[in-house]
């Protein structure tokens, strides 16, 4: 994702230096203790306590200390939000009667307000999530703005067609909004995933009930305030903080929710699809887990491949669904690649995410912290070679040392399961045919990458790999214009681009009898 925000020369100083230079020249100094303004439930453009009056703590992962209490929504709160959304979607409502171009203007206005408050939002994201502030400001917020503005431009351009059917008839299609859209967003990119969900839904005229992740609710709730300020009618966007088994399950199984979009684990994706099918057969789009292969051919530019493979795995503390978490290296360059990758990992700066020199902050919470350490222990027990890292990186907070394993075999747990942390696994291969089979031998199929100077190899691998996105000589290059989604158990449907609009519309055919048809 960083490549979308920081276009740099193909050769040049490594990522940390680029970020430091960008930080000193472009990024305002953060307030390391931003005030929390929004910690309730947002329904009908108003703030509410939970029906149960329950709250839960959101925690600063750098320290383990509580930031504040947040209203804990559950089924009753979801019911209230759905009713508000239904009212906003009624025929003749201000939202339904609004011109498509005006919907676009509201999205542009929302983007402008987010840009106005960019420094505050970046600091709040870092406080609640733990990602480096420079990344929050330069990458996440930049992509949020681009996504919302991209979909604002689509609002009056995604439409139906006239169809020349036989006989004295006039036939045309309409692209109509689906209705009440449940959206459940993850904790690894809270603001960005909110934009990915809201952009296409609002551009096409839907109404939204969104559940934010309990680990990172604060920035998405602040954006709710900006949604009201932008002028969206009451009930168009409703945001419920809460937990998956309660608030999330209520959305997935609700009889009056017409569609659910979820980004998160494959395990939870299963539950959502079952709940959707056993309720009202609501539409489902799922962006789930991954174990993405990153293939380094022997003819690759070694400097570039090492740095990009490091970035592919360690970016965002390794908390990326599309992380290059199986690094396949051709045998004649394996030793050199491993040596250089270990050196790069050892030089990675882990620390205070508000320090502009920091490359890696803490994991999002204690649960993830312990889970990752458990995977590291599993790798050692199953015979992988621990080359660096392997433990906690600080006395407090949820920091983990950048970790690299060599001599990893396909059957090992760390080579099969999504770790979602700063743990690199390097595997050796001989031939291109071999690596295709091994790369595809996974239940996941979200992304893949190939590093080679041979265009024929690149083209062959891009066609052979079972993944929704394949990067050639790059990694994590995203644009609002390009669709993203997975094969197999990495999900269904696509987000971003024109393809991302399809899941939020129903295509209606209208056929009219006419006295006489003329060409």
Swiss-Prot record:
Q: What class of enzyme is it?
A: oxidoreductase
Q: Which Gene3D superfamilies match?
A: Aldehyde Dehydrogenase, Chain A, domain 1, Aldehyde Dehydrogenase, Chain A, domain 2
Record: residues binding NAD(+) = 264-269
The pathway to which it is assigned is: Alcohol metabolism; ethanol degradation; acetate from ethanol: step 2/2
Q: Which InterPro entries match?
A: Ald_DH/histidinol_DH, Ald_DH_C, Ald_DH_CS_CYS, Ald_DH_CS_GLU, Ald_DH_N, Aldehyde_DH_dom
Cite the residue span of the transit peptide: 1-19
Report the locations given in the UniProt record: Mitochondrion matrix
Where is motif SIFI-degron found? 12-26
A cellular-component GO term for this protein = mitochondrial matrix
- Show the GO MF annotations: aldehyde dehydrogenase (NAD+) activity; carboxylesterase activity; identical protein binding; NADH binding; phenylacetaldehyde dehydrogenase (NAD+) activity
- Similarity comment: Belongs to the aldehyde dehydrogenase family.
Q: What does this protein do?
A: Required for clearance of cellular formaldehyde, a cytotoxic and carcinogenic metabolite that induces DNA damage.
* Oligomeric and partner information: Homotetramer.
Which named protein is this? Aldehyde dehydrogenase, mitochondrial
